[in-house]
Amino acid sequence: MSEFSQTALFPSLPRTARGTAVVLGNTPAGDKIQYCNGTSVYTVPVGSLTDTEIYTEHSHQTTVAKTSPSGYYCASGDVHGNVRIWDTTQTTHILKTTIPVFSGPVKDISWDSESKRIAAVGEGRERFGHVFLFDTGTSNGNLTGQARAMNSVDFKPSRPFRIISGSDDNTVAIFEGPPFKFKSTFGEHTKFVHSVRYNPDGSLFASTGGDGTIVLYNGVDGTKTGVFEDDSLKNVAHSGSVFGLTWSPDGTKIASASADKTIKIWNVATLKVEKTIPVGTRIEDQQLGIIWTKQALVSISANGFINFVNPELGSIDQVRYGHNKAITALSSSADGKTLFSADAEGHINSWDISTGISNRVFPDVHATMITGIKTTSKGDLFTVSWDDHLKVVPAGGSGVDSSKAVANKLSSQPLGLAVSADGDIAVAACYKHIAIYSHGKLTEVPISYNSSCVALSNDKQFVAVGGQDSKVHVYKLSGASVSEVKTIVHPAEITSVAFSNNGAFLVATDQSRKVIPYSVANNFELAHTNSWTFHTAKVACVSWSPDNVRLATGSLDNSVIVWNMNKPSDHPIIIKGAHAMSSVNSVIWLNETTIVSAGQDSNIKFWNVPF
């Protein structure tokens, strides 16, 4: 029997940047979409989250990924101009080759219909595009003729082959081949061209731009055949930049995504809009990308939300929420059915653990990085953030009601949070204070050191504060006052502390990779003399199992390690690369055998760790 297994994954959302198109890929069957965040490529089923695959072999930030029409390989690009071609049929995703295309970010990739050639465009120094054979990397032509960065590229899916591209010089170019050479450019747009796409049979292609227009062309020679116009607007398709377009599988319709916060469905025969789908009213509701697979129409909002669009009804059937910035804290509800996660931008998500369905807590509780989040048996949510506030979000409806959050201003920046199970006591470790919140009243106690983390015993008797002075300061808690009863010296700055659920032990971790448990009853002396230093980098977080027997730690070394207090000399369970290429920022136990981890990669993973 394996020591551990991953049982679930709640994946990151796509990385987004305002005013920049998000290019999506999909599998030949149309049952999965592909997007990028960090150094990873995500292949996500449109029907569920359970079978998400993550490719993590890029050394630099990824930008775009496209699977070949054969379905056997994927080509993914990064900000340094590298295109990696890797196997999609095996979970190990064996690398076939890496092609250095140019010296800047790859913005779009396209395969030919034979899965032999790849065109990649972007923002290089010497060139903005390249076409090559996928198996050898040999050049198969020259994509020149546009004066500025190329944003979009597409292969004609039928012979005679063509390549089209859209550029920041406001033009659309067409190339003949193979080998491919420049044929002509078309200046139908007055601003940047964001997207160009062929229809499924290659008879037509369309382009979109920052001028809000969508232009239709003949697929072979690029002759302009029409312009899509919304009668409610003046000679344009959208009132904002159009960042993406996609053809329906039957080629009779086009869907467009725009900065005007709408998605529009167009009839290709009439060049008229059939459905206008408003997504929202906020800046983050701008639509940056869209793809119409054989099974779903999917768009990406500026905040990374994944929208599943019903083109027949002109509505959004489902929205997938999540994070696309580092997850900094986790907490689960008392009944173990709901998970709360917080990130570096101040967002909080609630997750149904059994299904993976998520919701964003609106309005946002904080505007900056959340450093601590805790739930109570009453369903309330306590949070602290770099905005120097401790907030209490009351239970409401099916989750929490952030519109009724109670804010408490702190005198210095909070770095950690501990809350009693009933919510009667909350303690925040601040840069220059210990903040104690009890029954609606906030008391701040000055300290002479800089704190880094905090823990509260379940009986509310002790508070342990980890310091940047390489010491654990243990206090006796009496009402809203504390008195220091023990100082424990470590070899390096304390990174996390936690009391066991029965109050028998206190564990502390530090930057020197050490995990050290102490006996509370024995005046916080060492609980054992074994050296728990299996991590290879700073330990970032720690959590006790409900039965007080095991504890889990997460580290900058990408791993999660499970330690056993009953067998301190045994080799621990090491989940190496639990979050590949990413620090593990938070770990919690759901039950005696299930750990949840979250990392810098914005992913949440569930691990079964049997005894």
Swiss-Prot record:
Q: Where in the cell is it found?
A: Cytoplasm, Cytoskeleton
Q: What are the recorded Gene Ontology BP terms? A: actin filament depolymerization; locomotion; muscle thin filament assembly; negative regulation of actin filament polymerization; positive regulation of actin filament depolymerization; regulation of locomotion; sarcomere organization; skeletal muscle thin filament assembly
Q: What GO cellular-component annotations does this UniProt entry give?
A: cortical actin cytoskeleton; myofibril; sarcoplasm
The UniProt entry annotates WD repeats at 57-96, 145-185, 188-227, 237-276, 322-361, 446-485, 489-528, 534-573, 579-610
Q: What is this protein called?
A: Actin-interacting protein 1
GO terms assigned for molecular function: actin binding; actin filament binding
Q: What is the lineage of its organism?
A: Eukaryota, Metazoa, Ecdysozoa, Nematoda, Chromadorea
Keyword Repeat assigned: yes
Q: What does this protein do?
A: Induces disassembly of actin filaments in conjunction with ADF/cofilin family proteins. Regulator of actin organization in myofibrils.
Keywords (A to Z) from UniProt: Actin-binding, Cytoplasm, Cytoskeleton, Repeat, WD repeat
Q: Which Pfam families match?
A: WD40
| Similarity comment: family membership | Belongs to the WD repeat AIP1 family.
- Does the entry feature the keyword Flavoprotein, yes or no? no
